[in-house]
């Protein structure tokens, strides 16, 4: 990491650099288009259902998280995705981003956070273990959701009441 890390909202001027991080992190996966759509939507119209944060080291975007509340629910938080530059992996960037997202969801009165994880270890190596290390557990799953052999796993983390 170069310099001090800060977590900032992804603004319109920052969107191209944040998008580039997502493209590099997910370029060989089936999940890139959905992640970019979520990011653009969160920046274009930030609100309870979608917000985006970036981890910055100086002027460099190291990672991005998109999160929000499920529309029409009471206290159901959602982690859309987190993406980190390859060079910044295993340095606490993803943990810092998810922690900031969870804190913001808690401030929005979320009771829990749900991450809808494609259970695709070849494309998203380490994602399940990362979420489990942050206190998420598999609540349920839909087998063959994305394609044959690739399930949708619902990973849940309870938030402490204030």
Predicted regions and their residues:
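Short low-complexity, flexible loop/linker segments enriched in glycine and/or proline
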Residues: 129, 153-156
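Conserved GNAT acetyl-CoA-binding A-motif
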Residues: 105-120
